[in-house]
Structure formats: C-alpha cells, structure tokens
A protein has these predicted regions:
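Conserved N-terminal phosphate-binding loop of PLP-dependent enzymes in the Aspartate aminotransferase
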Residues: 2-452
Length: 452
C-alpha cells in the first residue's frame, strides 16, 4: 500500500531540485519530509519529532509556532499581505525601520530592505561603490574581503567569498577581490600561537589596505565568526583592529551579520563585542525569528546623504525587488524583536553559552578525530579529521560529516555539516534539557561514525 510519505517522496523526486544538494545521492536516500513544527522540534509526515539543531538553516530564534509570531502574521494578513515600497510606504515597514535603528550600533540611521542575506550583501556592495562615485572618487571600485569567506550566492556575494567547491563553474562571472588572511591558527598560522597569529593577521591587513587605499571602496567581513566558510572564529581584537584600519585609511567598513546578527553570538549584534559601528551593516536570517524571508542593509547618514540630489543628477540608488520590505515579514520581525526584550532572551543565553563552551572543551575536544572546536555564542563548528596528530583530513568521498548527521537523524536530531565540520546552531530559545540532548546525541554520533 502506498503511503502519504511514499507519494510525497515520488513527487519530490519527480519535480523538486534541492539547494546545495547532490540530487543523485538525495534520490538514493530516504528523505525526511517535514509537515509541521512545534517549539524547538520539527515533525515529519509520520509524526516523528526531531530536535532542530541548526535552527532551520540558522534562522529560527524562538522556536516554531511561537504564538506571538503567529499572531503578528495573522493580524497583518487581515490588513494587507503585500504593498510595494517603490513610490509608496507602509506601516510595518516604517515601524520596523525605526526599531532596527534603535537597536543597531550607534550611528546607523537608514534601513534598505531586501529578502535574503545575499541580496543584503549585494546591496551593500552597490551602495559602497556608488557612494564613492557620487563623492567624485571614481577609482575606488575595489572590494576587500577575508580569505575563504562566504557571503552568499549572487554574483557579487560569490565574488566576495569565493569557494572553489561552490563557485568553480562560475569563475568567469566573478570580479577580482583583495583577499585578507584572517587569524585562524588551525587554517593559516599553524606554527604560531593565537597572539602571534592575531598580530600577523593585523599586520597583513594594515599593509594590504594601506597599499590599496586609493582604489578600495570597502572591506566586507563577517564579524567574529565566518559561518558558512567553516565556522572560523576570530578574536574580538581582530574586529576592532580592522575597523580602526578602515577608519584611518578612509575605507568603508561593511559587516555581514546575516548569520551573526540577532543574538547568535550572545549579543544582539557581533559588532557589540568590540563596541564598533560599521559604515554599512547587512542583516537577514534571524530578523523575522525564522518565519519569513526578509533582509535589511543599514547605513550611516553620511552614506545616505551622498545619494540625495535633483532627479537629473542621477544620484538615486537604483535597486529594489518586488517583495522588498514585505509587510508580513516586517510585522513578524517587529514581534520577533519585541520577544527578545519581553523574554530577556540574551540574558538567558549566557549560562547556556558557558555550558556549551565547557561541554565542547571537556567532552568533544578530547575525541580522537575532533581536531578543533570553534564557538561564538550559539554558533559552533566541530571539525573532524582522520589523523588528529598530523591534522590529516578525511578523503571527501568518505562523507564522514554526512554520515554523522544521518546517524543523528536516527536519534531524532537534525543537524547539517559543512564537509566534515559538524555545525550546531540551535534556536536561541532552546531549553537546558534540549541543549544537553543536542550535545549528547552529536557526541554519540561522532563516536559511532569516526570512533573514539
């Protein structure tokens, strides 16, 4: 007898093309088909519950079916589902812009909406380059970014964060970028301690940015944690230093907080750890609590003012998408931000962040095939290698990371790897018992797949 799951599986295999998924492999595995959510759990068509260990790709904040967020969407839906911001405005878009400016690093005054992290970054790039054109510095078109970073999958964001694995087929579309080596001891500075690596990385950044300051429009970076690049952590001093270097050399400083924003690092924005304000800030993922696609690019008044002029001066920022600033997304984003305050969410996270750090250090790091653990708040990367002593990676074809997450699924926990780096990114509202379960299952699955 054909079940509902079997029917959906057949339809999926017939019609659907999944993102970042090798479809031949996908069609050879039994799919997990989600039908609903409840709290920090996803529920499949069989009724089986899974702990959402990666916040539905790093965006869920308070859990699924959060009453206040559900209600906000219903209330907005009774008014209007969508109205454009091109030549018009709308209530929830205005109100959210005010709230974002109020909580953002001091000095960010203007909000430009879009619908994904990649588009938020793309907008920042276009703003930065056009800003310098409008200021009469036409040579300043070059962009700098951190080596092996990841900023999205549009052409501009791919150029910023080039990955040979992801983007090799699109090289001809990409523009050249000045690469700055970040202070990752495990990746780049194996012969140095953390202090020496930080000094070396800052020295390189100073030199490269100084040498290219006359042509550089901006430096773009993810603060404190390079997420999809492999959960590469940075010390606060690095963020502070790059902000200072850009300020001294007159280079716009753009922070991509698509992943790190909205509480992920333990503060509302990662830039708060260094008490700095970028010229442009990119936000997405957690902005709606993980409910609807929405993104925002915030700028200083200085940047915004450069675009003001008579129509025939062509200073307009010619960018905008159909669903930019969708009212439903803005309404649920407002409710999401209200919940941060009402539930003292950031304060409640602090002991859990300490618990995560202790478990990672005491339980995971001693494992024979765990070479490194990297954490900022609720952003965690556990790197698996074949030979820990010699830092020898597994052969990619072994799919060790993939095998770990399949094993976790058998134990009703959903996580997702980046190669052989196991990513944990739980909802910010996760409870103590659920957090312990996430760690226990991940630990057991690493041991089961890779050995002790």
């Amino acid at each position: 007898m054909t079940t509902y799951h079997d029917e959906l599986k057949q339809l999926d295999h017939t019609y659907l093309w999944h993102p970042f998924t090798q479809m031949q492999e996908w069609m050879g595995e039994e799919p997990c088909i989600i039908s609903r959510g409840d709290g920090n759990y996803l529920i499949d068509v069989h009724g089986r519950k899974y702990l959402d260990g990666v916040s539905s790709l790093w965006c869920n904040v308070h859990g699924h079916r959060k009453k206040e967020l559900d209600d906000a969407i219903r209330e907005q839906l009774e008014k209007i589902a969508h109205s454009t911001l091109l030549g018009l405005s709308h209530v929830s878009g205005i109100q959210l812009a005010q709230k974002l400016v109020e909580i953002a690093p001091k000095g960010l005054k203007r909000v430009f909406y879009s619908d994904s992290g990649a588009t938020a970054v793309e907008i920042a790039l276009k703003m930065a380059v056009q800003y310098w054109q409008l200021k009469g510095e036409s040579k300043r078109t070059q962009i700098a970014s951190l080596a092996e970073s990841y900023h999205g999958d549009t052409v501009g964001s791919m150029s910023l964060g080039y990955s040979e694995t992801f983007h090799r087929f699109h090289k001809s579309l990409l523009f050249p970028v000045l690469r700055i080596t970040p202070p990752h001891v495990f990746r780049y500075y194996q012969r140095l301690n953390e202090t020496a690596a930080l000094d070396a990385a800052i020295q390189e950044a100073e030199q490269k940015l100084d040498e290219n300051k006359s042509t550089l429009a901006a430096l773009v970076m993810e603060p404190l944690m390079q997420g999809a690049a492999g959960m590469w952590a940075q010390p606060v001093g690095y963020l502070h230093a790059l902000s200072d270097i850009c300020r001294r050399h007159g280079i716009l400083f753009i922070l991509d907080e698509v992943a790190t924003g909205f509480g992920r690092t333990g503060k509302m924005f990662a830039s708060e750890h260094a008490a700095i304000t970028p010229n442009i800030l990119c936000l997405a993922k957690g902005i709606t609590g993980g409910y609807l696609p929405l993104a925002a690019t915030l700028s200083t008044e200085e940047i915004y003012s450069a675009f003001l002029g008579e129509y025939n001066e062509y200073k307009t920022f010619f960018h905008g998408h159909t669903y930019t600033g969708n009212p439903l997304g803005c309404a649920v984003a407002i409710a999401n931000l209200d919940l941060f305050k009402q539930e003292s969410l950031l304060e409640k996270m602090q002991p859990r962040i300490a618990y995560l750090a202790r478990r990672l250090r005491e339980d995971f790091l001693p494992l024979a095939h765990v070479s490194d653990v990297r954490q900022w708040g609720y952003m965690i990367g556990i790197e698996l290698v074949q030979d820990k002593a010699n830092r020898k990676n597994y052969v990619p074809e072994q799919r060790i990371g993939h095998k770990v997450i399949l094993e976790a699924r058998k134990q009703s926990v959903l996580i997702r790897p980046l190669g052989d780096i196991i990513i944990l990114m739980p909802p910010l509202g996760i409870g103590d018992g659920e957090l312990a379960t996430l760690l226990d299952v991940t630990y057991d699955c690493i041991r089961a797949v890779a050995g002790d």
